[in-house]
């Protein structure tokens, strides 16, 4: 009932059309393990979870989520981007030079434990982003969402529109 397909170097894992999976034991759920040697992107749509069991080491990693699922990753990369629409959570840890976080909806990007030199964070809606920036932080909020940061960035550029807030933790 689960299909896998590789298109243009991308692995797609999904259920067959009109199939709704129900595990025989809800406590244990359904797990799919994907061993990787090289990866540049992770995308989740729907209500599943993606969890890295080890540190993902790559040059550039893009995470995209739409829906109510959760992504939890430990990353070592030169550049990391996280974008979300919906009500899920993206939780990131590790190290990167450049981190970009964009969120619309009511989800959260929790990246206090992803230490970055340069951070660009954009919130629209009621979502929250938590980041650590060492050199540069560009933060934008429109709506009621918040951006909270750690670190002592040398350059801080912030703008808010609405009741949202940008603050140091």
Question: Locations of the language-model features?
Answer:
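Acidic (Asp/Glu) and glycine-rich low-complexity loops/linkers
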Residues: 1-45, 49-64, 74-79, 91-98, ...
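Short, surface-exposed interaction patches in beta-rich subdomains
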Residues: 90-169
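Short, surface-exposed linear segments at secondary-structure transitions and domain or protein termini
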Residues: 61-63, 83-84, 140-142, 159
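Mid-length scaffold segments of soluble, non-membrane domains
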Residues: 70, 81-83, 89
